């Protein structure tokens, strides 16, 4: 029996984001800049991470509260050993209709088949440039874009449904929009361009670095004939368009210029086992890991999750101004703990 619960703003709970690790093999400036996350950076020890059994238990309880979709994030989730074991466990939960994973793609050839065999069917690959030199400068690990493109080709060849996510920063990679759109249009792969967000504390964000949806659309319409597409479901974060000549869709995610707080249905669990109701959360999250390890029953866990959702009133992107951004500096949870 699924309970229907809503938060203070009337938003139901439909999605669960599970961060399985705080580690990543890239050092992108907007997420894990190398100056902060150097070779001597201390990541979470294994006992500080939720176990797969704990994650599956959490997901099962959330499914009883209305969660239908789960997304596995990180850090880089493919760095978590035996991730296919978690995928298999999540696939056995009644009520979960969709399991996705967000990855930088570097380890897809190594782990893609085992994840597919465990039941994973859908992945989002983060790729912020198609130019090799530029992409190397973005990831700060000397990884070429062509390497990731080969991993994407492999993923599609084994049956994974791939979408590509691109975070656009003004003056950094906004010149990649057209060539990337052209490349993935020909590949019949959906690409989504994301406005640069002020997630975490270390990415040097300010409004001047944002390329808005309208600015992107103006650029795109100078090169392609497109039509808008109606939203597929409540809470869809991207504004979708379709190429007139071959029908391939692409999306623009307006995380800054046109917020979607009013339809946000996502609960988030960080890699250290804490609940957050918002990607931009500033207060320390509720420690689900400690709560579970104290010996609570599933019913007690459900009541706690209900209470956390019912007091949720987060709407940071609705309220974002230069002042709120300044006030929240050094207070937000970093992206490698909570995922995207």
From Swiss-Prot:
The reactions it catalyses are: GTP + AH2 + S-adenosyl-L-methionine = (8S)-3',8-cyclo-7,8-dihydroguanosine 5'-triphosphate + 5'-deoxyadenosine + L-methionine + A + H(+)
* UniProt keyword Nucleotide-binding, yes or no: yes
Task: Give the matching CDD domains.
Answer: Radical_SAM, Twitch_MoaA
Where does the sequence pass through the membrane? none
Task: Kindly list the positions annotated as binding [4Fe-4S] cluster 2.
Answer: 261, 264, 278
- Share what the entry says about its subunit structure, partners included: Monomer and homodimer.
Write down what this protein is called: GTP 3',8-cyclase
User: From which lineage does this chain's organism come?
Assistant: Bacteria, Bacillati, Bacillota, Bacilli, Bacillales
- What's the encoding gene here? moaA
């Amino acid at each position: 029996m699924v309970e229907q619960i809503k938060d203070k703003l009337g938003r139901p709970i439909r999605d669960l984001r599970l961060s399985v690790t705080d580690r990543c093999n890239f050092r992108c400036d907007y997420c894990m800049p190398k100056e902060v996350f150097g070779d001597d950076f201390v990541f979470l020890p294994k006992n500080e991470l939720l176990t797969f059994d704990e994650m599956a238990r959490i997901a099962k309880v959330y499914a009883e509260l209305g969660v239908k979709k789960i997304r596995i994030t990180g850090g880089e989730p493919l760095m978590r050993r035996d991730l296919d074991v978690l995928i298999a466990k999540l696939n056995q939960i009644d009520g979960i209709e969709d399991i996705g994973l967000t990855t930088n793609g570097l380890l897809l050839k190594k782990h893609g088949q085992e994840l597919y065999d465990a039941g994973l069917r859908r992945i989002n690959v983060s790729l912020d440039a198609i130019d090799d030199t530029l992409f190397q400068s973005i990831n700060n690990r000397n990884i070429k874009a062509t390497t990731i493109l080969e991993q994407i080709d492999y993923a599609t060849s084994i049956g994974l449904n791939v979408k590509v996510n691109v975070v656009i920063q003004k003056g950094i990679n906004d010149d990649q929009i057209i060539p990337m759109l052209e490349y993935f249009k020909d590949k019949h792969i959906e690409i989504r361009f994301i406005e640069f967000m002020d997630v975490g504390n270390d990415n040097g964000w300010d409004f001047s670095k944002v390329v808005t949806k309208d600015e992107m659309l103006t650029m795109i319409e100078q090169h392609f004939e497109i039509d808008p597409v109606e939203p597929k479901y409540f809470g869809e974060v991207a504004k979708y368009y379709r190429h007139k000549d071959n029908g391939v869709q692409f999306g623009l995610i307006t995380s800054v210029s046109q917020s979607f707080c009013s339809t946000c249905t996502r609960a988030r669990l960080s890699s250290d086992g804490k609940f957050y109701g918002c990607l931009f959360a500033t207060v320390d999250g509720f420690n689900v890991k400690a709560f579970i390890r104290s010996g609570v029953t599933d019913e007690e866990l459900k009541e706690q999750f209900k209470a956390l959702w019912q007091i949720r009133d987060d709407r940071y992107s609705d309220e974002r101004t230069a002042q709120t951004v300044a006030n929240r500096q050094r207070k937000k949870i970093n992206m490698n703990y909570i995922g995207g």
